[in-house]
């Protein structure tokens, strides 16, 4: 089978992080058939240099947006340029384990009814030997449905999905773009899973926690609650309770939100 990798690059990315990401793609035991890299607006000359360096090493397909449109819209645009129905997501500052694609291709071949699946991540600081936490997500469809009521059930940078299914349900939203999408897919009763294996080393710091707080993120929680209730993912009282907890967390100072993540949401 053939598959596309979908990535989005923006001006504030660190060139060294991008280089390490690309190196992990070069080192894959099963190479991607194409890598669609969306430039979400103008990027720095240093980032352009790294991309040019790897154009001879990776099957890069560049999609350049004239203005920054945000991750959700950039990914929606990138999907339209993916030649293959199976799309593997990757972030430009993370690092794939060497056999990530090999494992995911094997899963698809063993489970052709699959629509979406991902895996586990190890979060790191300075380098992949500096593991600070793990974000574990459930592996079975039944556990994923239950998990979706309260938290995002997939690690976005590990996910592989069928492009047609994502486009048919409306694609990505602007805020909390992945969680909205997973809710819509889960509600359709499609075959889904997560591998128990760590597939990606995810970089922490780099503004990760601060991007998850703020008034707009808090407002997005109300839309999440309404979507989960409307699609039958979560009941009214349980949904309101979850909304209150998630809404409040979005308004915490960054230092407190970081402690919340470390204490309750990571292992």
UniProtKB/Swiss-Prot annotation:
- Its domain of life? Bacteria
* E.C. number: 2.4.-.-
* Signal peptide segment: none
For this UniProt entry, the molecular function terms from Gene Ontology, in alphabetical order, are:
glycosyltransferase activity
Q: Which UniProt keywords apply?
A: Glycosyltransferase, Transferase
Q: Which InterPro entries does the UniProt record give?
A: Glyco_trans_2-like (IPR001173), Glycosyltransf_2 (IPR050834), Nucleotide-diphossugar_trans (IPR029044)
Q: List the disulfide bonds.
A: none
What Pfam families does the record point to? Glycos_transf_2
What family is this protein classified in? Belongs to the glycosyltransferase 2 family.
Its protein name is Uncharacterized glycosyltransferase HI_1695
Q: What is the organism field in this record?
A: Haemophilus influenzae (strain ATCC 51907 / DSM 11121 / KW20 / Rd)
